[in-house]
């Protein structure tokens, strides 16, 4: 990651968090060798990069009422998005913005109404170029809505008073792979602001500074993906080459940039712990990469929880 950390390695404290109800995960981390830096300006809708994370919920209205009762920092009331679905926005103590959306697929029950991430909102400079990237490389081939306006559902979000084009994308085909049952489906909303000149969210900052630093995908066949990205004009900018050993887990990771420089990470998992206490590890290279792991095996990951 030296190209994105000022050319020097840095130490950090990282936590990987998942919700076994379903959805993606978060890698939450903090530099320990330097002070993480915020953006030098107030972020606004349409700024280039990952502006907001979409969180799935079984009941969006109930989630809104719960978070309101907990005095969460809500940015909007319960509203309808351009597609007519219930949604709302809030921010965490560090200013990171989250959107709560209706989840369409679930892995487990869970104690909360919300699951894990189910996509994000990304600011772009050229909608056609970005749609091509997310369709050709990441497979988001279905347009849910494509509208241009000053959007009332975003009133309360910085920069939402500007005219913008919003395009929500999803996959037409179910996801495949070892973790597909857990990770589930996702949607990407691309936003291009019409009435202002946006800025790059990570301008003059490092990967790992405050904010959403990249979007990560679990993938199979890294070599084929490398050729696909290169042919599309987006070659890997970082490549761990073969297997990267992380102690209890191992895999191969790489990065590409979208047309505006937003970082996309690809991870091909080779080994994960199922039950560390008894030394049970799963070597994913020895199985059919397209088939999902059995539910009971994924649920066993809860025994690796670090408290």
Question: In which residue ranges do the predicted regions lie?
Answer:
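Short, structured interface segments
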Residues: 27-31, 85-110
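A common structural junction motif
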Residues: 70-75, 141, 232-237
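A short, acidic/glycine-rich surface segment
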Residues: 1, 35-40, 105-108, 150-155, ...
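N-terminal beta-strand motif that seeds the catalytic metal site of vicinal oxygen chelate
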Residues: 48-55, 101-131, 137-154, 158, ...
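Core segments of cupin and vicinal oxygen chelate
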Residues: 1-23, 69, 79-81, 123-185, ...
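C-terminal functional regions that serve as terminal interaction/effector modules
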Residues: 170, 175-176, 182-194, 207, ...
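Generic structural signal for well-ordered beta-strand positions
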Residues: 96-98, 143, 264
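Vicinal oxygen chelate
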Residues: 6-33, 37-66, 86-90, 116-126, ...
């Amino acid at each position: 990651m030296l190209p994105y950390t000022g050319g020097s390695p840095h130490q950090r404290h990282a936590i990987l968090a998942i919700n076994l109800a379903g959805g993606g995960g978060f890698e939450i981390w903090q530099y320990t060798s330097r002070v993480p830096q915020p953006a030098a300006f107030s972020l606004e809708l349409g700024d280039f990069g990952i502006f907001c994370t979409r969180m799935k919920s079984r009941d969006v209205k109930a989630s809104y009422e719960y978070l309101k009762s907990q005095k969460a920092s809500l940015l909007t009331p319960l509203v309808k998005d351009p597609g007519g679905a219930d949604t709302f926005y809030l921010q965490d103590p560090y200013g990171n913005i989250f959107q709560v959306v209706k989840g369409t697929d679930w892995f487990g029950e869970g104690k909360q109404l919300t699951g894990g991430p189910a996509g994000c909102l990304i600011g772009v400079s050229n909608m056609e170029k970005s749609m091509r990237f997310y369709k050709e490389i990441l497979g988001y081939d279905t347009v849910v809505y494509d509208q241009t306006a000053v959007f009332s559902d975003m009133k309360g979000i910085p920069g939402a008073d500007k005219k913008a084009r919003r395009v929500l994308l999803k996959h037409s085909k179910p996801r495949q792979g070892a973790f597909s049952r857990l990770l589930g489906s996702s949607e990407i909303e691309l936003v291009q602001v019409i009435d202002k000149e946006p800025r790059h969210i990570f301008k003059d900052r490092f990967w790992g500074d405050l904010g959403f630093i990249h979007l990560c995908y679990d993938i199979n066949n890294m070599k084929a993906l490398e050729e696909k990205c290169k042919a599309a004009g987006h070659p890997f900018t970082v490549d761990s080459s073969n297997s990267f050993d992380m102690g209890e887990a191992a895999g191969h990771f790489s990065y590409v940039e979208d047309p505006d420089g937003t970082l996309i990470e690809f991870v091909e998992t080779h080994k994960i712990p199922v039950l560390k206490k008894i030394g049970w590890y799963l070597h994913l290279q020895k199985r059919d990469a397209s088939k999902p792991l059995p539910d009971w095996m994924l649920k066993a990951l809860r025994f690796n929880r670090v408290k």
